[in-house]
Regions:
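PLP-dependent aminotransferase-like
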Residues: 77-144
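Conserved active-site segment immediately N-terminal to the catalytic lysine
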Residues: 169, 183-194
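PLP-dependent enzyme catalytic core of the Aspartate aminotransferase-like
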Residues: 2-4, 316, 329-358
Length: 358
């Protein structure tokens, strides 16, 4: 079988061992005679799956007991509406804009009430993330929202905000489980699964218990976090197979040694790629060094007419998904947990050869 390295931003690369395990269990899960795809979400087999998935996720991500974990649908985009519906309660909210996705969260929240921008780096092209020390927080606001890793612009927060006055809400879609996080610093964390957790379709939400009682009475039941908690994320049929696949990824991470181990691997991979980009004038990355994402690495070629031929040449060598997002162009390598360092080395070797020939 042809070796392919998938640098797509999402849906993204999955661990090979996870894919092989899913393949072996596809037609008969643990002697049940059924595929997980066929199981009733309320049957004993699937209930055992989802309970273990939550237990493993809590252990892996060190989720405190006073937080609930939800397995929902609609992607992070749905949370752009669910956050104000569940938290605003007639107050205003603060938003930090550090890239396309955090700006989208702000814009999607506007119909629900008074939203203010606490900080923004849009004027500098999102070249760095606004420092939490500079956020203009309104202590009477219902919450402050930010995106801790911007997938398109390649901007990541490494020093998380420590704000005690109001709840902090974080969109962690594209770097969740890439390193340990102190969850007690947050009121809500949410993440689409299709980047660093598993297949598309699943959205994980972590909510502190004290934030479950302030939802707007107009909140649809499927959007109400408390209602979802009371129904074990099953107010409607959940994304059963995506949850099962996420569970296999959690087991893979646990067997690997946990988030401390995967963080070291991610640092090594990012250093290899950024190291080569910085070593030559042929390629460049525009992001402030202290905010360079370990997961999403955008870069450009000095002669921008070469971007298309670079991507095509990479595809011919089995490296796919390198075309930059349509909003910013250029090239982007998404190097999530499941991307082996061999994939990064193959990309760097190709970058060297491409530079020599151009």
């Amino acid at each position: 079988m042809k070796c392919t390295y998938n640098f797509s931003a999402g849906p993204a690369v999955l661990p090979k061992s996870v894919m092989l395990r899913a393949q072996s269990e596809m037609l008969d899960w643990h002697g049940s005679g059924m595929s997980v795809m066929e199981m009733s979400h309320r049957g004993k087999h699937y209930m055992s799956i989802i309970e273990k998935v939550e237990s493993d996720f809590r252990s892996l991500f060190n989720v405190p007991k006073n937080y609930k974990v939800l397995f929902l649908q609609g992607g992070a985009i749905a949370q752009n509406s669910m956050v104000p519906l569940n938290l605003l309660h007639g107050k205003k909210a603060n938003y930090v804009v550090s890239g396309y996705w955090s700006k989208r969260s702000y814009q999607d929240a506007l119909p629900f009430g008074d939203m203010t921008i606490a900080a923004s780096s849009e004027a500098i092209g999102y070249a760095k993330a606004p420092d939490p020390k500079d956020w203009k927080i309104d202590s009477s606001a219902a919450y402050v929202h930010f995106c801790s890793n911007e997938t398109i612009h390649g901007v990541e927060y490494f020093d998380m905000p420590s704000i005690k006055t109001i709840p902090v809400v974080a969109d962690m879609s594209s770097h969740i489980l890439s390193r340990p996080v102190d969850i007690s610093q947050f009121g809500v964390i949410y993440a689409g699964a299709q980047k660093n957790i598993g297949p598309a379709g699943l959205t994980i939400v972590i909510v502190r218990d004290d934030l479950l009682d302030v939802a707007s009475p107009l909140t649809p039941s499927v959007f109400n976090w408390k209602t979802q908690v009371e129904n074990q994320s099953m107010i409607n049929t959940p994304t059963t197979y995506s949850i099962y696949m996420a569970g296999l990824v959690f087991e893979w991470l646990i067997e690997l040694g946990g988030l401390e181990v995967i963080e070291k691997q991610n640092i090594k991979k990012a250093e290899l790629l950024y190291g080569y980009i910085d070593s030559t004038d042929f390629y460049s990355n525009p992001i402030d060094i202290k905010n360079r994402s370990r997961m999403n690495v955008p870069f450009r070629i000095q002669n921008e007419d070469l971007h298309t031929s670079f991507v095509t040449g990479a595809e011919n060598l089995g490296m796919i998904g390198l075309k930059g997002h349509r909003l910013v162009g250029g090239i982007r390598a998404s190097i999530y947990n499941a991307m082996p360092i061999e994939g990064i080395q193959a990309l760097v070797d190709y970058m060297k050869d491409f530079e020599k020939s151009h």
